[in-house]
Amino acid sequence: MQLTQTNCIACGNKLPVPIISNIGILCPTCRNQGLFRKKIIITGITRMNSGHVCVSGIDPQTWSFIRPVFSCGLARDFLMQGTSQVINHFNLVEIEFKQYRPDQKFHTEDWVINENFAPRFVRHLSNQEIINVVSKISITNLNVAIEKQDKSLFIVMVQSIGRIWHEQYEKFRVRINFVDWDGNLYEKIPVTDLLTLAFIRHQINIGNMNYSNQIMSNFNNNPNRYIRIGLTREFHGQHWKQVTALITVPDLFDGQSFSYYENLIGGQV
């Protein structure tokens, strides 16, 4: 599906002329700018291979998703300032980028990080601000949104989580069944959200095997309930769905970070 870009992906200003393109377009000023220092509302912190993480969020200037990328992967140190986790869900964080580097399909959100600039914490959003953000950018039908092939990150309004469970093979895994707001069922979707993974691993360690019912009850009875979905890079001919955050207001995890739970379990999840 071809889309028409009318605004600059970096600054949000109107382009001189509309351009038919799946990916974002830079205006002439931004194209010649060089470094971009942008404030990002963090909405996703996910587990990758080899101890790396993936971070992404929303640019409140353009209301588009941004995924900071680094040539050799993002180490967990990128998220921290000393012992404090600077990059946390719904923190506003300033990050400097070298360039916009989108794929032609799905992964149109990629921006290359300037590794010489440490992320700077600005503030944490209030509950009302979080509600305003997710209300503005959320979708009700994940299948329809994916058909456009113009993004790989989505915040989905959800009717309910039907099941959540863990598996242990070569590494600890969690999967979810859920129904989006329009009634579509998604089954056995893997969870890569570090906070959810670390929380559930901690619950198991303390012997709380009823964690599934507790999460579903707290999530399904919250009036503000969303699941953030990310699509993988192409693998075996598909872009696979992953759950990259469980979002509720008030917060399902009482404002705790994944690093808090990893400290409790004594290692990386």
For each feature predicted by the language model, list its residue ranges.
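Structural detector for short beta-strands of small beta-barrel domains
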Residues: F36-V53, I139-D193
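Short, cysteine/histidine-rich loop/knuckle motifs that typically chelate Zn2+
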Residues: I9-G12, T29-N32, F90
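Short nucleic-acid-contacting surface segments enriched for D/E, G, S/T with interspersed K/R
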Residues: D77-I95, I206, S212-Y226
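N-terminal ordered "arm"
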Residues: F36-I95
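Short metal-coordination and nucleic-acid-contact micro-motifs, chiefly zinc-binding Cys/His arrays
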Residues: Q2-N7, I23-L26
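OB-fold/S1-family single-stranded nucleic acid-binding modules
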Residues: N91, F97-V144, Q149, L153-M157, ...
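Short functional micro-motifs and their immediate structural scaffolds
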Residues: P16, L35
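Cysteine-rich micro-motifs
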Residues: S21-G34
